[in-house]
Structures are given as C-alpha cells and as structure tokens.
C-alpha cells in the first residue's frame, strides 16, 4: 500500500488535484456505460506530462492504458488495474487557411463543425463520429465513404521509446481501421489536417444530411460503441448478422439493435459480460452460418469480475 501511495504522491507532484482520481468507475468514461473501476485516472493537460506519467508507471511497475473519450472502448466488469491516462484535456485547436492542427482530445464532431464554419471541406463525414481526434487517427475512423486518412498531413506522436516525433502521411501506413500508430502502439498527440476551401452552405447541408441519416438509421438513443464489428472483406457485418436471424437478439441487458444490426447496445443496464457474451454469440452464429469471421472494431480491455 505504501508503494501505491508513493506512486500517487509522485504523480501529484506535477498533475493537478482535479486531474488525478482514485478508484473511478470506467462506466462513467465509456460510451457503452459499462466497466468496473480503474485504480487511478489521470488527465494530463500538457504533452510532456504524458511522458512523465509513463516513466512513473514503468518505475513503479504499474500498468497504464491510453484512452480518449471512450467511444470505442469496452472495459470488463473487473475494471483496470493500474492507470487510465485520459487525453481529452489535450484539446487545443488552430485553424489556418486550409490547415487545422488539432490536439488528440478534440472531439471529431466539434472539429467537423469548426471546419464547416471556416468553409473548409473534407471532414463532413466525421460530423457524427463520437470519438476524439487521437483515437480516430490511430484507427483511421471513417463513415459515409470518408476516412480520416484522406485529410491527414502529419501526426505528432510519442513512440514506444518515449520520444516525441512527427509522422507524415507516407509513414502512417493507413489501412481499413488501422495505422502505424495502432500497429506500433504509439500515442497520437496532435494531428495536422489539410482541407480544401469549399462553399459553406454546401458543407453545412452535407453535414445536416449525414446527421439526419445517422439519427434515422442508428440506435443513438442507447449507449453503444458504434459499429461493434469491422467490415469483413466482401461482406457487410450488419447484413450477415441480420441474415443470421440475430436482429434484436439479447443477452442480459445487451442487445443486437433492431434498428441497425451492426450495433450492440446497452439496452437495459447491461454488464460488460452481457455485451461480451453477445459479441461471442454473434461471432459464432455468423461463423457457423456463413463461414465468415467477424472481428471486433471495439477495443476490449480490463479484467473479468
């Protein structure tokens, strides 16, 4: 216990009191609204603080997890042993003629609207994606025929040796829901976007149209992590799930949405185990019916209860 207190004391030397919390329910920090407690939640306000936190974790042999706004995250019911480093306070935004520099904690929807306000086109597709910039660039988030990779010029990262460096587009190895950042477990700090000048009214109309389509077709009224599964090559996950007769299928408080089969939702006070059991059931059913493997798009971390 003294060892843990020493670790907390070392963190509190440079992390503001309000940005350092003990024994925090992760369900309050994920869009699924499930998950057990994390031992320590820390919210750095400067890039340099991240390195210092990681150095302390290594010194005291403490696990750490990098999280954004938790919109693509499922934390198991036993929670997280160690430290969750939440990057949402790294949210500076600079807008130039056709460039935007965004901190990793900037919400994507906010970024999309700011681009619209400056008559910059290229980020309309991101208007309804609930993630933040750091997670979005790491997984090359996309929707409605748009992807983050189409508009990224460079990303400032912390590499796995703790060094800060800038990766340019050709070094980022973007693929479907993947990048060099994800592959090498780098931490995305700041992204430079290159956009095009456009007609503000057309940009606004496109955003309005995409938001309307989202509201009509997605179960936004329930907690979820967006699309639960990646798109398998040559197929659509939602169609495979629906054709397997799983639309509306529930386990505990979790359900395959009857509005969009690609979403597993927290319909009625689900546990993480309910959601994980339903994910496994869907994967097994689709595999047995169509011989197609469904890989999860959502990131799953933590311990079972």
UniProtKB/Swiss-Prot annotation:
Primary gene name: murB
InterPro entries associated with the record: FAD-bd_PCMH (IPR016166), FAD-bd_PCMH-like_sf (IPR036318), FAD-bd_PCMH_sub1 (IPR016167), FAD-bd_PCMH_sub2 (IPR016169), MurB (IPR003170), MurB_C (IPR011601), MurB_C_sf (IPR036635), Oxid_FAD_bind_N (IPR006094)
Pathway: Cell wall biogenesis; peptidoglycan biosynthesis
Function recorded in the entry: Cell wall formation.
Domain FAD-binding PCMH-type, first and last residues per copy: 33-198
Protein's name in the database: UDP-N-acetylenolpyruvoylglucosamine reductase
Documented EC number(s): 1.3.1.98
Names of required cofactors: FAD
Domain of life, per lineage: Bacteria
GO cellular component: cytosol
Class of the enzyme per the UniProt entry, highest EC level: oxidoreductase
GO molecular function, one term: UDP-N-acetylmuramate dehydrogenase activity
Subcellular location per the Swiss-Prot or TrEMBL entry: Cytoplasm
Species classification: Bacteria, Bacillati, Bacillota, Clostridia, Eubacteriales
Biological process terms in GO annotation: cell division; cell wall organization; peptidoglycan biosynthetic process; regulation of cell shape
Pfam families: FAD_binding_4, MurB_C
Keywords, ordered alphabetically: Cell cycle, Cell division, Cell shape, Cell wall biogenesis/degradation, Cytoplasm, FAD, Flavoprotein, NADP, Oxidoreductase, Peptidoglycan synthesis
Protein family according to the UniProt entry: Belongs to the MurB family.
Entry-linked HAMAP family: MurB
The reaction(s) this protein catalyses: UDP-N-acetyl-alpha-D-muramate + NADP(+) = UDP-N-acetyl-3-O-(1-carboxyvinyl)-alpha-D-glucosamine + NADPH + H(+)
Catalytic site: 177, 227, 297
């Amino acid at each position: 216990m003294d060892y843990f207190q020493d670790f907390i004391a070392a963190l509190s030397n440079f992390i503001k009191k309000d940005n350092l919390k003990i024994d925090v329910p992760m369900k309050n920090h994920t869009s699924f609204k499930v998950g057990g407690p994390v031992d320590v939640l820390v919210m750095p306000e400067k890039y340099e603080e991240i390195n210092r936190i990681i150095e302390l974790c290594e010194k005291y042999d403490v696990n750490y997890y990098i999280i954004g706004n938790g919109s693509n995250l499922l934390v198991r019911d036993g929670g997280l042993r160690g430290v969750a480093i939440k990057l949402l306070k790294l949210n500076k935004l600079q807008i130039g003629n056709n460039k935007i520099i965004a901190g990793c904690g900037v919400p994507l929807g906010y970024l999309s609207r700011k681009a619209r306000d400056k008559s910059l086109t290229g980020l309309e597709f991101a208007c309804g994606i609930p993630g933040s910039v750091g997670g979005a660039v790491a997984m090359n988030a996309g929707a409605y025929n748009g992807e983050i990779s189409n508009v990224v010029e460079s990303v400032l990262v912390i590499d796995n040796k703790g060094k800060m460096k800038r990766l340019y587009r050709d070094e980022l190895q973007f693929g479907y829901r993947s990048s060099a950042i994800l592959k090498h477990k780098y931490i995305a700090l700041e992204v430079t976007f290159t956009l095009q000048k456009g007609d503000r009214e057309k940009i606004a109309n496109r955003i309005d149209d995409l938001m309307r389509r989202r509201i009509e077709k997605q179960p936004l009224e329930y907690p979820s992590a967006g699309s639960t599964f990646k798109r398998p090559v040559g197929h659509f996950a939602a169609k495979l799930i629906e054709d397997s007769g799983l639309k509306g299928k529930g386990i505990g408080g979790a359900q395959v949405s009857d509005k969009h089969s690609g979403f597993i939702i927290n319909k009625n006070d689900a546990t993480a185990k309910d959601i994980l059991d339903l994910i496994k059931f869907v994967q097994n059913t689709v595999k047995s019916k169509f011989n197609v493997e469904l890989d999860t798009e959502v990131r799953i971390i933590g311990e079972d209860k």
